């Protein structure tokens, strides 16, 4: 790589490149690809260090923005506290994941690049150098190309890699900092607020892609839910270790006591050992029940079985309700630091991601919708649609052809 770079600068690249065999050319292209990827990782790590030093010296961009708002509030009457609360209540950022075959990267490669990034952030040492060399060697011997063109679910797995990383590390801390900073403005960010959420087109964007069917969309959503559950369980493992609060030493709310009893009754599969050793630790029992209900919810979606109240979660609101029960009990019983710490960070992350990990946008060309509506109602105008929505008559779906039926299956 270095020889070719030097030759290019000297205008002598043809002397090297013209003598390469096909195999050597492929190796050279791969080497340059890895070189640029590794250079990008090194630059990102260095940039991260610069930003961290800047944050430690002058505060984050968010804290500086809050400082500017506070300064403006002192000299301006254009907005008041009520305006600030309204703005924050309605504040919403929603990044959307998309996919393109040219941007697809194997998770094996992404994982190794992440390892290299983490190693570069460690102090220089012989161990660090050896592990960097080992990981780069593994990267070189890993085929960065899949055997075939990525299928929609392959692309979904690729985006989920980033969603998992965001849920596990970044988003809980970002939202905690956001809540802390806006509090300086006298604004409370409710735990159900969604200043940050995520969307995806992957598995739902069927506009011009015949491979995206209703089954593919459903599989992508199930995949997202299973990964959300898996990553959230890591947070719950941390939480269950932390909330070792004993009723011998502090009280708990009647609501929490009743909730735990209901959970234990409706979830008989919770091991008797957990019931016994955590008998005086209701928060641990509650988190254990949440864990079981999440796994049952995941299985319910996979099996397409009906919701069973008390055994699984109908939606994200029910999951958040369980966390709210714990929060209120902690706040009323000298557990404010715990309630506003790990528990709050997990709660805000759940509000951001929801059970589906990211909200899927279903995208389809309007012609497909009009085609379906014309087969159903012989018309696709807004007037006829409104009329049919108010009608109670049964619609005959057997007359739909394959094209119309494909569109219909997306929604029913």
Please identify what each model-predicted range represents:
Residues 395-412:
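C-terminal amphipathic alpha-helical interaction region
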Residues 1-390, 396, 400:
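Often metal-dependent polyanion-binding catalytic scaffolds in large enzymes
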